[in-house]
Amino acid sequence: MHRFFKSEFFNFEFIRILSAAPYGGAEIAECLVAAGQITNDDPESWHRAWIIQADKAKALGDEALHSGDTVSARRAYLRASNYYRASGYMFHDRPGAPDARVLPLAQQVLDTYALTLPLLDTGEASQLKIPFENYQLAAYLYLPRDRTKPVPVLLSLGGADSIQEELYYVYAASGPQLGYAVLTFEGPGQGITLRRDKMHMRPDWEVVVGRVLDFLTAYMQQNPSVQLDLSRVAVVGASMGGYYALRAAVDPRIGACVSIDPFYDMWDFVRNHVSPALLNAWNAGWVPSRVVNGIMSMAMAASFQAKWEVGLAMWFFGVDSPTQTLRHMMKYTLARADGTSRLDQVKCPVLVSGATQSLYLEPESDVLRVFDALAHLGDERREIWIARSPEEGGLQAKIGAIGLVVQRTFRFLDQHLNVTR
């Protein structure tokens, strides 16, 4: 496949932005101009290139709205929101390495995206606040315009580095047109809850989704006109969001689960990136944490991708050293302490996918392990999809093949939620 950047990381993230083009989140020429202004592995040039395009798109949206052209305004605001997201993507704002630009850029994404909501032509959209412990989780509910009968609900979960405004370009842009209500939200360690509220990540996503389902039940009782069919609720997520979807699927209120390119155990991911011998020696107490921290710090200094990945994990876990990050990663697994799998509690149908050209994961050690742990469902209620080439979904999270993953997801959900058109 054609490459735009020498860096695998920058190339992947650029394709990620391009992937939003069919759904209004990018314009090809704008992206190519931005690419020409970006220096490989230079986060500042990445930021500058995308902020320029974001400001231009925002101005075009304002101009179109002023003249009464709501179609062009919607398209421009969607692009601006995505470009603002991209402009801040390479930055972190953790206590040990603060960056004052992170929160204002996140707010620009929110403010610009809010301008699109009344202009969307794919259905109705509203902003919600979901009570969770001592916080309010930001959420969007997208509804089909035709709700003469109750509609199934899809919970679209973000992952480690996505924000829910970006999730629009995947399922929220298509779901309402196919007769589904789609709910997105940002849980602990995600999006604005991390940047503004300083909520850090947690592995037990069944608890988070459980609160969301409780909220939807109360919301439906208070707003019956939304016509949500809470007997037909599905969950979908990609990468870490795929792990979250599998954790959520243990809730008996979930009627179907789609897990796109998940990991089974985050520690396996670590072992693929750091010497297993070093990790084993450190974990056994033979090598002190300061030595591992020093080695990982040198790796971060030598590679921007490593610096970004470790820095992101330190940020969303709320820790200040690489070894503390490793300790937290051990908690993110589908295995119980006794060696059994949490997936034995899943009773709903599950579609799980893998990507052989993933930037991060190995299908053989992750997706097949997930699929095998779902054997109790039988072949009628579990499905596996391992994609090999980019156009077939071979990149992580099916980046570059959004239309295909949307098609396969809703085909699976239609079948198992008894949706007919």
Curated annotation (Swiss-Prot):
<feature type="active site" description="Nucleophile">
    <location>
        <position position="239"/>
    </location>
</feature>
<dbReference type="InterPro" id="IPR050261">
    <property type="entry name" value="FrsA_esterase"/>
</dbReference>
<dbReference type="Pfam" id="PF06500">
    <property type="entry name" value="FrsA-like"/>
</dbReference>
<protein>
    <recommendedName>
        <fullName>Hydrolyase poxO</fullName>
        <ecNumber>3.7.1.-</ecNumber>
    </recommendedName>
</protein>
<comment type="similarity">
    <text>Belongs to the AB hydrolase superfamily. FUS2 hydrolase family.</text>
</comment>
<dbReference type="GO" id="GO:0017000">
    <property type="term" value="P:antibiotic biosynthetic process"/>
</dbReference>
<comment type="subunit">
    <text>Homodimer.</text>
</comment>
<comment type="function">
    <text>Hydrolyase; part of the gene cluster that mediates the biosynthesis of oxaleimides, cytotoxic compounds containing an unusual disubstituted succinimide moiety. The first step of the pathway is provided by the HR-PKS poxF that serves in a new mode of collaborative biosynthesis with the PKS-NRPS poxE, by providing the olefin containing amino acid substrate via the synthesis of an ACP-bound dec-4-enoate.</text>
</comment>
<dbReference type="GO" id="GO:0072330">
    <property type="term" value="P:monocarboxylic acid biosynthetic process"/>
</dbReference>
<keyword id="KW-0378">Hydrolase</keyword>
<dbReference type="InterPro" id="IPR029058">
    <property type="entry name" value="AB_hydrolase_fold"/>
</dbReference>
<dbReference type="InterPro" id="IPR010520">
    <property type="entry name" value="FrsA-like"/>
</dbReference>
<dbReference type="GO" id="GO:0016787">
    <property type="term" value="F:hydrolase activity"/>
</dbReference>
<comment type="pathway">
    <text>Secondary metabolite biosynthesis.</text>
</comment>
